[in-house]
Amino acid sequence: MDRTIVTNATCMSCGCLCDDIDLHTEDGRIVRAERACRLGREWFFGYHGDSQTTALVDGRPASMDEAVEAAASILARADLPLIYGLGNSTCESQRAAIMLAEDIGGVIDTHTSMTHGPSKLGAQLVGKVTCTLGEVRNRADLLIYWGTNPVETHPRHFTRYAYTPRGKFVPGGRYDRTMILVDVQDTLSARAADQFLQIQPGTDFELLTVLRAIVRDQKVDADLLAATGLTLEHATDLVAQMTGARFGVFFFGTGLSRTRGRHMNVAALHSLTMALNAFTKFAAVPMRDLGNDVGADNVMSWLTGYPVGVDFSRGYPRSNPGEFTAVDLLTRREADAALIVAADPWSTMPEAAVEHLETIPHVVIDRAGAGPRANARVQFVTASPGIDAPGTAYRMDWVPVSMRAAFNSRQATDEEVLGRIRHALAAA
């Protein structure tokens, strides 16, 4: 048996983008992923490098050339084609997808619109103060998780970046840090926290507004605070901990950005963060879900000027969340073809959107091991980023990570497939 160890592989199972994973391989298969969490093991053990299938057309195996021609034909005939996904693809592939969207005069949207799209809008409203996870590890002595459950969604966030590691200015690790969780329900993360503040659903904006008023020594609306489920004592104690910290960080999730208030919640959090900087160093970092959601935001912004929901139907980019975002286009039944890249809208989108997606011709580009899509007209089986496909991805703190391939790939990369579709359209 041919056994090898590939060191420092990158895991794209979540926004932590851990790049310290040692892969133990046997005859080209991953048998152990050292230091990987539960989600990471699922990512690596889901790798099927021995897959002989490169493409499917109408559910049957097909050559790459046949599949490319079929995909190009579907997109060329569409009046308003939609390209969606990209959260588990490389920045290079995301760039190719945007160029394809421009070529076909379609709409391109990413997984961000369903998770932290409101976070982008909130930051645009008031600005933001942020930091890297390296700064958190070495400096932060107060961690406030808001509307997120990292124990289950980002299992190594505590141990690798935030709560337990020993840092330059926090040599005692967790003994030099305080971790507070603000959420609407008891979770595994709440049980790990030093302090858990359970608030009423849909009252994040009110609580953030009250906290900022206390920070700025302004009058507090007692009725507003009572609606949150916390007392004035709770709020003043929390503010005292925030202003007394040497370096504090908010980590916020979709429990803040996707609940009542949406982007205004995030704007309120960033406003509170900026107010706290009059007393101490404070920052805010979103807990991003997929491995390269942040990369998709960045590449979309670089090339189009907008992070989500970009429409090229008029020959130039324009964006309007709620109009050109994928869920809305599909729910209104406006898109008449779709290209899904490294995403699973069937398990994440509302039923109405999925129902329409199933009625229109759609092409799927996803890594080996994702499984066949029964109703996909064309499906490409591609290499897995960070496993057998090199490229660049962005961590949740906007730090780029260069990924090398641990194996020689038998499949094409997402970027190569998208490039071939563009070439076929240009030659038609």
What spans do the regions from the language model cover?
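N-terminal, charge-rich interaction modules
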Residues: T7-D20, R258, M287-S301
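N-terminal export/assembly segments and adjacent metallocofactor-ligating motifs
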Residues: M1-D204, T209-A213, E334, I421-A428
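Non-catalytic alpha/beta scaffold blocks inside enzyme catalytic domains
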Residues: K120-F279, G305-A428
